[in-house]
């Protein structure tokens, strides 16, 4: 029996949308992951304040991953509370599995601004979602660190989807259609609880 391989997808999930689930499923298949854990932020330090409460965001995640047995929710950041730093989350991971932090090319370009980014890169693998056929271009500081430590970035071919949580929130606030942007149970939950209005 080999080492368990776990993908980690952090985010505000405010709200969780179809691209989040598609990325998690693609990563699981392409990287041969046993599980992908979605980690909702308590208070992301680089973002605007969250619109939906932690209980609402957790419930929407539960609804979104129903029917996806290899996806799970890891509430560590919400349970810890306060400012959310990836380094703290990574340090709290139990030993044993091989972990892959899933990030987009925009996050990759900002990675060296993350608190204790070298510690993150030393502890877990970094998997970057890229357009199919595109190559990864890490910032120079990260590229130098990776070469010095004989580490590499894992490419995750993922066709970009024209969906963002901020756009969805704007649409919901304007009572505009969000068809195809949200998992259906999440859309129903948002409507029932009058979120993002």
Curated annotation (Swiss-Prot):
Q: In which pathway does it act?
A: Cofactor biosynthesis; NAD(+) biosynthesis; deamido-NAD(+) from nicotinate D-ribonucleotide: step 1/1
- From the UniProt annotation, give the residues forming the signal peptide: none
Identify the keywords attached in UniProt to this record, alphabetized. Answer: ATP-binding, NAD, Nucleotide-binding, Nucleotidyltransferase, Pyridine nucleotide biosynthesis, Transferase
Molecular-function GO terms, alphabetical: ATP binding; nicotinate-nucleotide adenylyltransferase activity
**What InterPro entries does this protein's entry cite?**
Cyt_trans-like (IPR004821), NadD/NMNAT (IPR005248), Rossmann-like_a/b/a_fold (IPR014729)
Keyword presence, Iron: no
Reactions mediated catalytically: nicotinate beta-D-ribonucleotide + ATP + H(+) = deamido-NAD(+) + diphosphate
Hydrolase as a keyword of this entry, yes or no, is: no
Listed GO biological process terms = NAD biosynthetic process
Its EC number(s): 2.7.7.18
**CDD domains, alphabetized:** NMNAT
Q: What does this protein do?
A: Catalyzes the reversible adenylation of nicotinate mononucleotide (NaMN) to nicotinic acid adenine dinucleotide (NaAD).
NCBIfam families documented for this protein: cyt_tran_rel, nicotinate (nicotinamide) nucleotide adenylyltransferase
Entry's family note: Belongs to the NadD family.
Protein name, as recorded: Probable nicotinate-nucleotide adenylyltransferase
Question: Which species?
Answer: Bordetella parapertussis (strain 12822 / ATCC BAA-587 / NCTC 13253)
Task: Cite the source lineage.
Answer: Bacteria, Pseudomonadati, Pseudomonadota, Betaproteobacteria, Burkholderiales
């Amino acid at each position: 029996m080999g080492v368990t391989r776990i993908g980690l997808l952090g985010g505000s999930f405010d709200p969780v949308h179809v691209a989040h689930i598609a990325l998690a499923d693609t990563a699981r298949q392409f990287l041969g992951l046993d599980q992908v854990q979605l980690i909702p932020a308590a208070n992301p330090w680089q973002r605007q304040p969250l619109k939906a409460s932690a209980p609402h965001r957790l419930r929407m995640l539960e609804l979104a991953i129903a029917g996806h047995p290899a996806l799970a929710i890891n509430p560590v950041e919400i349970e810890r509370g306060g400012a959310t730093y990836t380094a703290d989350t990574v340090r709290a991971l139990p030993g044993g599995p091989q972990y892959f932090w899933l990030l987009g090319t925009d996050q990759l370009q900002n990675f060296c601004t993350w608190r204790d980014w070298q510690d993150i890169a030393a502890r877990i693998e970094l998997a970057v979602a890229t357009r199919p056929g595109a190559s990864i271009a890490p910032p120079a500081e990260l590229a130098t660190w990776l070469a010095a430590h004989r580490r590499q970035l894992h490419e995750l071919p993922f066709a970009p989807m024209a969906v963002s949580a901020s756009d969805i929130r704007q649409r919901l606030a304007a009572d505009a259609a969000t068809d195809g942007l949200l998992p259906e149970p999440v859309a129903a939950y948002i409507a029932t609880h009058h979120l993002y209005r």
